[in-house]
Each structure stands twice: as C-alpha cells, then as structure tokens.
C-alpha cells in the first residue's frame, strides 16, 4: 500500500529529527560539569562569590578562579590537552537558565578574551576564540608544556541578569608528561622583551584601587610609536602567584593614532596581597610584543 505522506514528507521528518538530535548532543556535551571534577550544579542556583571578590558587580577584583558566577558558567568536556603541539580548547558559556550564551558585548575589540597559563605562571597565551552558532567557543592554542593549566574566559553579557557586567570564569586542564616547574622571577621594576624595556611604577595595594604607570623605552630612548592594540595602546593582565587569581588592569590612555607612549597609566585592582605576574602586550610596526614582570601587592 502506498504511503499517503510520500517520500518527500518522510525525508523532511527525518531531517527535522536529526537536527533536533544534533542540538540535544551539543547541549549535553557541556552539561556534565561546570566546576572542575564536581557533580553538575543546577543553573538556577546562585553561586556564592569568594571573599576576595568585590561586592560591587563588574569590579575588576573578581578573581576568576570559579567556573560559575551568579548562574553563569564556563562548561567544557575537555579535562586533558596534548603536549607539544597546537591544539583547540572548546567550551561554552551558559546562562542561569542553562542555555548557551551567544549574545556578548564587544570589549576591547572582541566579544570574549581567553587566557591560558601554567600553574608556575609560564606559557601565557591570550587569544580570541571563534563562536559557533550553537554557543560553542573554540580557542586555538599554541603548544602547551606538560603540567596543570588554567583556562580563563573574560566576557560581558549583552543581555540577561548580568547585562553589562564583566565576568571572568576559568577551568583547569591537565597536559600529560613530566612537568618541570620554573621558578617565578622575584619582583622587579623593569623587564625586557624584543629589545624593549618596560618599567612599572606605583604602589599596589590589595583590594584597593591603585594607579600603575608603565613606561616603555628602547635603547634608552622613549618609545612613542605604539600602535593601537585591542582599542588601547597596551593590554595588561595579572596572575597571582600560588592560586592563579586573575586581574585585568584597565588602561586609562585614550587612543590617538600610531604614536602612543612612552608612558601608559593603568587602573589596578588586585584581589590579594603577594606577588603577581604581569603580562603587558603592546604593538609596534604591526608586531605584538609581550613583556612579563613580577610585582608585589601589599
């Protein structure tokens, strides 16, 4: 007997079923755990901020060590990444309703900033992942050395309960192999990178706004040809020695052509006392340079 629905309708029905199954798989891939190694939490529950977080939403003193904050979660099925070769890290940001977030505000030229660093504060990477329509982010990473790494996602939701609030979440991954820790350099006022000398001045205080000034020179002469990089003349990120607490230090210099420098003021808010490893990224002649320097917060 001939099927009255016909082969065309059967094909459409099968295609719809496959599409629905695909969406279910995508959501399930990120549903098992939003806090490293722990059972999944219901997204309607509001996480409790750590004592080091500012009580004011959006303040830079959020330490970035949680995988969930106020219902927003960083979800990933990846707990291990290979050593010694380029690799991708995939994750999603889910909202309090458990659905992947796809609507992000642009902050410093990108919708999401992704950072990777090893537990000894080496191997710093700052990349800008690509976002798929289903809410999956893919961060392309350079080769990783064996050890424990922390992956951070910094973003600002464009809608929802945390609209306009800067949120930093993170997860850890393991890179197999013999891990040889490298000692963190002692606090210093200057460091070099690619022939440039970076000098930092200012007294940093934990849990207090502190002015920090960076000066860039080359061969003893002030550098005045800094090009805009991420909507500013320099991008400054900090990680606390020991627990890897995160801080993004906000620039206070307005961009005005390709002649930034030599002095760059920043607004610093560090959540802890102790040593912090700063990573300053700046651009000249189309090349991005990264200088690392250790500072101490009282």
Predicted feature descriptions by range:
Residues 1-298:
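Intrinsically disordered, low-complexity terminal tails/loops enriched in metal-binding residues
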């Amino acid at each position: 007997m001939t099927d009255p629905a016909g082969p065309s309708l059967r094909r459409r029905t099968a295609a719809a079923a496959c599409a629905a199954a695909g969406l279910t798989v995508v959501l399930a891939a990120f549903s098992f755990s939003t806090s490293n190694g722990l059972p999944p939490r219901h997204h309607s529950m509001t996480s409790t901020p750590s004592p080091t977080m500012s009580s004011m939403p959006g303040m830079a003193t959020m330490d970035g060590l949680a995988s969930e904050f106020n219902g927003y979660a960083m979800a990933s099925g990846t707990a291990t990444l290979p050593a010694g070769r380029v690799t991708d890290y995939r994750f999603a940001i889910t909202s309090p309703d458990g659905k992947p977030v796809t609507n992000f505000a642009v902050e410093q030229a990108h919708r999401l900033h992704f950072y990777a660093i090893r537990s000894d504060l080496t191997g710093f990477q700052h990349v800008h992942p690509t976002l798929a329509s289903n809410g999956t982010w893919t961060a392309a990473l350079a080769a990783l050395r064996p050890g424990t790494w922390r992956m951070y996602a910094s973003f600002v939701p464009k809608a929802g309960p945390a609209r306009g609030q800067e949120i930093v979440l993170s997860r850890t991954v393991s890179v197999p192999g013999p891990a040889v820790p490298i000692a963190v350099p002692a606090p210093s006022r200057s460091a070099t990178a690619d022939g440039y000398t970076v000098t930092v001045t200012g007294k940093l205080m934990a849990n207090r706004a502190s002015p920090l000034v960076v000066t860039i020179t080359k061969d003893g002469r002030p550098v005045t040809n800094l090009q805009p990089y991420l909507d500013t003349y320099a991008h400054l990120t900090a990680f606390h020695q020991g627990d890897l607490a995160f801080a993004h230090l906000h620039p206070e210099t307005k961009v005005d052509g390709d002649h930034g420098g030599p002095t760059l003021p920043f607004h610093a808010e560090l959540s802890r006392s102790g040593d912090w490893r700063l990573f300053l990224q700046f651009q000249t002649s189309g090349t991005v340079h990264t200088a690392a320097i250790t500072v101490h917060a009282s």
